[in-house]
Each structure stands twice: as structure tokens, then as C-alpha cells.
Amino acid sequence: MVYFRQIFLMIIVVSLHCCKVRFFCIVANAKELDDWKVLTVENGERYRTHVGRYAGEEGGEKIKLRVLEKFRALLDLIKPSTSRRRNLAESASFSPWPAPSPSPFPNGGPIESPAYPPAPPRPIPPHLRRPLPQRTHPLEQPEIQRRKHEKGGTFKKILVPVVASTASAIGFVVCVVGVFCLCARRKRKMNGKTLSFKRKKGKSQSSTRKVSVNPTLDFLYLNSLGVDLERQNSVSVKEIRETEKDLNGINGGLLEEEVKRSIETEISHDWDNASSYSTKEIVSVHENDEEQTVNSVSVPVVVINDSSDDDESFHSVGGGSQYSNPRLSNASSASGSVNVGSSQRFSEHKLDIPECSRSDFGISVSAPPPPPPPPPPLPQFSNKRIHTLSSPETANLQTLSSQLCEKLCASSSKTSFPINVPNSQPRPPPPPPPPQQLQVAGINKTPPPPLSLDFSERRPLGKDGAPLPKLKPLHWDKVRATPDRTMVWDKLRTSSFELDEEMIESLFGYTMQSSTKNEEGKSKTPSPGKHLLEPKRLQNFTILLKALNATADQICSALGKGEGLCLQQLEALVKMVPTKEEELKLRSYKGAVDELGSAEKFLRALVGVPFAFQRAEAMLYRETFEDEVVHLRNSFSMLEEACKELKSSRLFLKLLEAVLKTGNRMNVGTIRGGAKAFKLDALLKLSDVKGTDGKTTLLHFVVQEISRSEGIRVSDSIMGRIMNQRSNKNRTPEEKEEDYRRMGLDLVSGLNTELRNVKKTATIDLEGLVTSVSNLRDGLGQLSCLASEKLKGDEENRAFVSSMSSFLRYGEKSLEELREDEKRIMERVGEIAEYFHGDVRGDEKNPLRIFVIVRDFLGMLDHVCRELRCVRVPNSPSPLAPFR
């Protein structure tokens, strides 16, 4: 603020100085103007003098006013534009009157004209102000110079404040920059002092921040600490004492805080790099504010274990009353720590544990066993820095440490463990000793297993406290509860229904015994050492072998006899046929059979049977032959019945007649008119021709006409007459017409039942039937070749040949009958095609297409009949009135 005030005062002084110079210039110009007026006017001396005084006084006031306005404009109190307008108005109001013309008598003349004094000027309001009268005579040279001088002065009036303001702003900016530079320089000096102090402290403590790490330690037990301390060689008593002197020599709370901050910073950087070792030893050397002596050195050693077992415990070992300010390490919340202190000298190589601490914690320590012989030397590990991981901010840890210290100090008897000071030369670490037996009251001897993150093992407990067995899961989607609305699940009560645990476990529990048996069986069977087949093919053979569910000896015996295998087993055997290369590998294998897998053993046994897979195919053919023959015979008989139904159906022929007459009537005058026959494909197009109302089709009209004609025919028959006599004789013609229509619709709709075999035949594939007959013929020929040629003359194959010979005779007879049926049916189908379509030898690719067309037409006819039953005919002479 002081610099800012000085800068502001400097700006004001510079501005006032500029305005003062300008004021003196304006006063000089005003005096010259008065002198000129006195010299130029000879007559009217008093008038001129009076005007000059008036102008001088008014000019002085105007100059003062202008200076004041400029100063206000500089301070941003008023705008320059407003002052400019005000100056113009005042100059107009105080402008002098024009000078009178000179006298006509230059020498004075006889009569001297009196000079009248001018009237005092009155101020004119701005809104009534008139423009000045124009001069009739040219301006004189002094007036022109005066105006030029005024113009130059106006420019100077504008330039001077601008330059002054700019200079003041630049000066202010320069001052501010200088202040910031001074502050930054001072701060840099302070940081340099702090860094130099930290360097000195780092050099003094570098001797105590090196310690060797033994990765083979087991820090869960106290004996391992002693063994490890015997191998430590990086810390010396002299270095620790020198470090304590340096630490005690520091005075001031600020320096102590900086030291702690620097150490904690090094801890945070080194902690991440120290995770590669399984064990870490942390030594922290801190000073005591109360005692400034060398003997007050405190060296707590914090042992950190990376594992997070539940059996880890906190052990505190103290050795005297100087541990008045203990610190605990918070490196890991689940790791144990051991604090080892030396009271006055490091020559006492013992760790003392008070009896009070043992009694409080219930720990009994047994003597460690003798150390084993040292192993061969191991490569040396790099030393790690000492990490001070004390967190005094934690109130709970401080309270716990103070309590432990009091118990340790109050103890009288102690149990000591020998600890040797590490030598200057590093020695290879021995293998870890066996763990000490720690017996804690209320805790088992063996440590509990580590916590597992597998939530599937954490099963809920039942009423008796035992874990509930795992059942088969029911997959569903949970519904989240909504507090703002009521749901049906809120009304359920948990106590209203209880499960029968025994029943649900017996029904939906996992069969653990079977799985264990399977595992035992798998473990007993040794894994094969050799594989003759490819893994993928071997996997397929293994799956098919499970489907057989029989041994190799049973299969080979059944193949030799030609009987004894079911259809499923024969199908699996046929699928297991190996290739020629695989069969050659199996035959040429001379090694131990036990080394092969189960599938390879089975295949090798089958390969030893002559024509084993051909026998299986022959037996499968015999098993399926009868079913194939029955299916073909049923299909042929169905085709024959369908052909008979189409030829003998009187109603179908009547329907074709109605369609032919209707089509010829509609095609009158066209090339399609006058037809005597049409292909049955036209039946499917009747529903595409719609009437004028957009609903009635040509099929509706045909069905209506046939129903009416068939109804009249039925009523004229003997049965119709009997029914008419029983009914009322006084029926109206409309009622009779309705009866005719109803009886005719019943007859037309019965056409679906009459042509039922035609509808079934439409689903038959005639080419498939012909192919099936051909396959049966080929299979029977292969079976005959196998039995009569390949296996003939061998005594071992006599049973198979005899069983197949009887089947060959039956098969040949059945196939001969099938050939005759096939020939007859194909002739009937050809006759039906010619019966309806004429000569279609080269046009019809599918001989059964006629049956497909009739099936589709019967479906359309049944739909139209259902529609006509739902519509009642009104009192109208036209039968198609309901469709208009």
C-alpha cells in the first residue's frame, strides 16, 4: 500500500505541473491580445480600455475554469466532451461586439463625434441564443494569427493530459513488476536456505539409512528376529551415536518439523520400491527432547510381514525406563511389529521381555531348536533405506503404546533372547528356522487359515449351526423394493411357511458321492501315454463308445453271430467306421495295449474281426428293412386311394362343371371363351376375382350355386321327401330356399372328408419313395455279396452267413412286391395327370402336383362354406343379396 500511495501522488504532481505551464501560456496570450486592441483603435479609448479589461478579467476566469475542468477530467470526475460543450457556450455568450467603423475625418474635423459607452452585456439563455453576425469586412492579419495560435493550443490541451496519463500508467506497471520481483527473490532465498539445511541433514543421516534385507526370514516368530539380527552388518554403534548427536544439536520446532517432513517424503517414495522383498526391517532413530545426551538413543525395529493372516500379533519388547516416548509403526494394520531398544550400550546383546507382558497377553515362549548347518552362499541383496513409519497423529496408537510401555517397565523378571551385533563383513543367511510354538490363551495352537475371498464357501448356517448344503440353483431376476409404493411381497410373512430341509436336500442336492466315485475312478485309470489317432477323432470315438454301453468282447461276439445288438448300438457302430489310414495304424501297432486309450483299444479289437464294420452295416440294414418296406407300402396304397377318390368324386366333378360354365360366361368375347376344359390351377384363382362390392368373390358365387342345386336335388330324393312330409307343409318359398341352401352347404363342405387321401398324398415326395426302393435294392445286393462271397467257406463265419441267408430270401421277396407296387402306382399317377390335364408327359415335372392343387383348393372351399353358413339370406329373389 505504501508504494501505491507514492505512485498516486507522483501522478497528481506531474498533472498539476503540466496544467500550470499551460496556464502561464494562456495568460501571456491574453495580455498580447489586450495590447493589440489598444494599439489598433484610436478613437473610443475609454471604450477599448474597458473592453480590454473586461476581456482580460473574463479570460482569466475562463482559463482558471478550463484548468479546473482538465484536472477533473484527469481524475475521471467529468467527461471531456461535457467541458468542451460548456466552453463553447460560454465563449458564445461573452463574445465582444464588433468594432465601430473609423471616423470620416482623419484629422479630427470640426465636430468630434461623441463616443457612447456600450451597454453592459446580458447573458443569453442557451435555447434563445442566436448565431453571431457575419463579418462584412475581411479579417485582419493579427486575428488570423490569433486563431491559428488557438488551434495549436487546443491540440496541446488534448495531448498533454493523454501523455501524462500514459506515463503514469507505465510507471505504475513498472512499480508493480518490481514489487513482485522483490518478493520472488526473497522467497527464493528462503527456499535455498531450507534446501541447504535438508542436504546437510541428509548427509548426517545417510549413515543410518542403509540396512541389509534377508528375504528368507519368517517374521511371525521371535526367534527369526534374533537370527536375522545376527546377520545384520550395516549398522554400527558409532554411526548411530553420531546421528544422535546431530539430531540432539538441532534447536527450534521449525527445524524439527522440516526434518520430519523430509523423512516422511523419503518414506513415501521408497515404500513402493521396497515391495519386492518378502521381509523388511525398519530402523528409526529419533531424538528425545528431555534428555540431550548420547545415551538417550532409541532404535525401534519394526518388522513387517507382507502376508495378511489372522494369526498375526503385536509384540513389544522394551528394556528400560528410557522408553518414555515410544512410537508405533503403521506400515500395515495386519502386520506384527517388534520394538527392540538398547538402553546405554550395544554390548548387551539381549532382548528382554517382562513377565507382566507375558502374563497380560498369555504368551509362553519355548527355547528355540539349534540352528541347522548353513547352506551354500547366496547372492547378496542390495541394501534398503531405513523407513520411519511412525504416525504420532494417531491417538489410538499412542494410547496403546503408552499402556504397553508402562507394563513393560513395571515388570521385574525378564526372559532374554540372545542377539548378536552384525559384523562388518556380510555373511550368507541360513535357511529359516522352524517356527516357535506360541500358546495364546483362548486360541488354538495352529494358526487359522487365511481369509478367503471366495463367497461361495461362506454358506449360511442352519438351525443346528451346521452349514447348509449347496442345492441346485433356481435362476430368476430379483425385484428391488420400492419404499414409495406397496407391493404384494410386503404382505408375505416369513413365519407362515417353513421348508422341509431333508426333503429338499434329498431331491435337489448335488450327488457328492457319485462325483467322488467318478473322481476316484478317474484317478485310478492312468492317463494313456500314446495316441494313434488325432485328438478330435479320438474324442468322437470316445463319445460313441459311451453310447454303445458294451465291452469290446461283447460287440465282437455279436458281430460274429450276426445277432444280439439293438438298433441304437448298430447305429453307433456304423458311425465309428475308421478311415483306411486309421485302420492301418491300428493294425500295425505292436506296442503294449494298456498304453492306449479306451476308444483306441476298442477300435483295435474291432479291426481284428474280419469285415466287422460291414457286418454291422448288414445287421443295421436287416433291422431297418421291415420298417422301410411297411412305410413304402403305406405310401403306395395312399397314392392309389387318392387317384380313385379324384376319379370317383361326383361332387368334385359337379364343382368343376360349375367353374367351367362360370368361366366361359365371364370370358365371352375373348380368346379364353368357349373352353371345354381347363387346368386345375384355375381353381386357386377363383378367390382373386372380386365383385363390385369388394367382398364377394367368384368362389362365393360358385359355391352358392352348387349349394342351391344340390339342396334341391337332395329334397327331391326319397329321403328329402320323407323329411318334407314330417316338417310343416305351409312353408314359404323363402324358407324352402333357405333349407335348400343349408343342405347344399353341408354337402359341399363334406368334400374335404370325401377327398381325405388326396390331402394326405399332397405331403408325399414321390421321388423320395423311388429313392427308398432303390436304396433297399442296393443294400440287399451288398448283403448278398457279403454273405455269399466274402464270408463263404470260413467256419468262424458260418453262424453269421446262416442268419443272413434266411433274411436274404425274405428281403428279395419283399423287394419284388415293392417293385410291382411302385410300377402300378406310377401308372395310376400318370393316368390321373392325363385325366385332368391331358397329355403332360413333358410338361409335368412333379406327377403329384395335381394332388397339391386339390388340397389347397379344398382349404379355400371349406373357408367359404363357413362364411356362407354365418350369413342368412334376406327376402330377396337373388341368392347373392347378402354379399352386395
UniProtKB/Swiss-Prot annotation:
GO BP: any one term: actin nucleation
Disulfide bonds: none
Membrane topology: Single-pass membrane protein
Keyword set, alphabetical order: Membrane, Signal, Transmembrane, Transmembrane helix
Cellular component GO terms, alphabetical: membrane
Region (Disordered): 89-143, 307-384, 416-469, 512-532
GO MF annotations, alphabetized: actin binding; actin filament binding
Predominant cellular place of this UniProt entry's protein: membrane
Compositional bias per record (Basic and acidic residues), positions renumbered to this chain: 346-358
Biased composition (Pro residues): 97-107, 115-126, 367-379, 425-436
Transmembrane segments: 158-178
A Pfam match: FH2
Record domain FH2: where: 461-884
Family: Belongs to the formin-like family. Class-I subfamily.
Function: Might be involved in the organization and polarity of the actin cytoskeleton.
Protein name: Formin-like protein 11
